[in-house]
Swiss-Prot record:
It is found in: Cytoplasm. It comes from the Bacteria. Pfam families: TACO1_YebC_N (PF20772), Transcrip_reg (PF01709). GO terms for cellular component: cytosol. Keywords: Cytoplasm, DNA-binding, Transcription, Transcription regulation. GO terms for biological process: regulation of DNA-templated transcription. HAMAP family: Transcrip_reg_TACO1. Its main location: cytoplasm. GO terms for molecular function: DNA binding. This is Probable transcriptional regulatory protein CMS0715. Belongs to the TACO1 family.
Amino acid sequence: MSGHSKWATTKHKKAIIDSRRAKSFAKLIKNIEVAAKIGGADMSGNPTLVDAVQKAKKTSVPNDNIDRAVKRGAGLLGEVVDYQTIMYEGYAANGVAMLVECLTDNKNRAAAEVRTAMSRNGGTMADPGSVAYNFHRKGVIAVPHADAPTEDDVLAAVLDAGAEDVTDHGEVFEIRCEPSDMVGVRQALQEAGIDYDSADVEFVPQVKVEVDLETARKVNKLVDAMEDLDDVQNIYVNSDVPADVQAALDDDDEE
């Protein structure tokens, strides 16, 4: 590969990374605005806002942007924040179930963009309820290995607070609980001196479908297309990617 074309490729990749970083910031800001609108700007009485702000800070969103988002959401700047949460259902390659969660101020735009992304990237839309039943809402808290000596330490800290399960995912321990127990589990971690990276309510698949490399690539292509949409906040799939397939996907990303 010539130096010129390599530079062009590098520049193109950097543009993609910068674009996705900007979109990530915008989505984090939306979460802060909505949390502040629902629960107010006072962090001490709004744990959802605390989580949204913490997540934004960990992703290096500037403090000025965070402060403005809190004030804007709480109505302190005279602006009206009016977002709707809408869930779209569909299937990726080989019947992999997909939920697409949107936070939008224009329902028609969101619907049109999700449908277009689905049809152009090998997915199909599904009727309401036909996919969602495969998932259930759970509180999901990620604790980095660096902040917790062992899985047993994490389990001991959160078991009495309502945690249902602790799983070791290599770099992080994942704690699952009922959404209503999230505050208690977070407090239990803090009391034990254990820091956490993120705490979110997610749609967790009840049954996962193991995928091969070709299917995983197709699913990732569709997920990437969805993540590029401004109105899309979260995407959930029920694919189970084996270690060897994930290694091959990681190699794809490095090329």
